[in-house]
From Swiss-Prot:
It catalyses: sn-glycerol 3-phosphate + an acyl-CoA = a 1-acyl-sn-glycero-3-phosphate + CoA; a fatty acyl-[ACP] + sn-glycerol 3-phosphate = a 1-acyl-sn-glycero-3-phosphate + holo-[ACP]. It is a multi-pass membrane protein. GO terms for molecular function: acyl-phosphate glycerol-3-phosphate acyltransferase activity; glycerol-3-phosphate O-acyltransferase activity. Probably interacts with PlsX. It comes from Escherichia fergusonii (strain ATCC 35469 / DSM 13698 / CCUG 18766 / IAM 14443 / JCM 21226 / LMG 7866 / NBRC 102419 / NCTC 12128 / CDC 0568-73). PANTHER family: GLYCEROL-3-PHOSPHATE ACYLTRANSFERASE-RELATED, INNER MEMBRANE PROTEIN YGIH. It is an enzyme of class 2 (transferase). SMART domains: G3P_acyltransf (SM01207). Keywords: Cell inner membrane, Cell membrane, Lipid biosynthesis, Lipid metabolism, Membrane, Phospholipid biosynthesis, Phospholipid metabolism, Transferase, Transmembrane, Transmembrane helix. This is Glycerol-3-phosphate acyltransferase. The chain crosses the membrane at residues 4-24, 53-73, 81-101, 112-132, 138-158. The keyword Cell inner membrane applies.
Length: 205
C-alpha cells in the first residue's frame, strides 16, 4: 500500500499533465486555447473555437485522465485518503501540466472523472446538477461552482467514507474559479450561449 499510493499519485499527475485541449487544437488546426478565446485550455473554450466535435473529444479525454488513475487505485484497495490525493494529483496535472509549461485548465472535467469511480449513482447526480445549473443560468462556470459546492454533501449521502477527499477536490476547483466567482458577482461573466452566438456570427457557414 505504502509503495502503490505514491506511485499512483505520480502517475495521476502525469496523466493530468496531458492537455487534450492543446493537442486536439493542434490536430484540428485551431488556435492555441491558452492564448485564444477565454485563455482556458478546456472543453468549453474548445467548443467556442472549434465546435462540438473537438470539444467532445477534449471532454472525454479530460474525464478519463481523472477517472483511470483513481479507478485503478480504487481496485488496488488504496484507502480513501490516498484516493483523494490521487484525484487531486490528476487535477493538479491538468491545472499545472509539466508537459505544457505549467499552464493548464481549471480541472472540472478531470475532477468529475476522478469522482466517478465512487459510483454511477453519484456520477449521474453530479452530471445532472451541472447540466441543470447551466441550462437555468447559462453559465458554464456557475455549473462547475455549484457542483463543487454540493459534491461533498452528495458523497456524504452515498458513500460517507469519501467525503473528506472529495471536499479537498471541491476546494481546489473553487480556488481555480476565483476569477469566475468575481465576474459572476459583478455580473460580468459571459453566458455560454452568448459565446457560441458570437462564434456563429464571426464564422458564418
Amino acid at each position: 500500500m505504502s509503495a502503490i499510493a505514491p506511485g499512483m499519485i505520480l502517475f495521476a499527475y502525469l496523466c493530468g499533465s496531458i492537455s487534450s485541449a492543446i493537442l486536439v487544437c493542434r490536430l484540428c488546426g485551431l488556435p492555441d486555447p491558452r492564448t485564444s478565446g477565454s485563455g482556458n485550455p478546456g472543453a468549453t473554450n474548445v467548443l467556442r473555437m472549434g465546435g462540438k466535435g473537438a470539444a467532445l473529444a477534449v471532454l472525454i479525454f479530460d474525464v478519463l485522465k481523472g477517472m483511470l488513475p483513481v479507478w485503478g487505485a480504487y481496485e488496488l484497495g488504496v484507502s480513501p485518503f490516498w484516493l483523494g490525493l490521487i484525484a487531486i494529483a490528476a487535477c493538479l496535472g491538468h491545472i499545472w501540466p509539466i508537459f505544457f509549461g505549467f499552464k493548464g485548465g481549471k480541472g472540472v472535467a478531470t475532477a468529475f472523472g476522478a469522482i466517478a469511480p465512487i459510483g454511477w449513482d453519484l456520477t449521474g447526480v453530479m452530471a445532472g446538477t451541472w447540466l441543470l445549473t447551466v441550462l437555468l443560468s447559462g453559465y458554464s462556470s456557475l455549473g462547475a461552482i455549484v457542483s463543487a459546492l454540493i459534491a461533498p454533501f452528495y458523497v456524504w449521502w452515498f458513500k460517507p467514507q469519501f467525503t473528506f477527499p472529495v471536499s479537498m477536490l471541491s476546494c481546489l476547483i473553487l480556488l481555480r474559479h476565483h476569477d469566475n466567482i468575481q465576474r459572476l458577482w459583478r455580473r460580468q461573466e459571459t453566458k455560454i450561449w452568448t459565446k457560441l452566438k458570437r462564434k456563429r456570427e464571426k464564422d458564418p457557414e
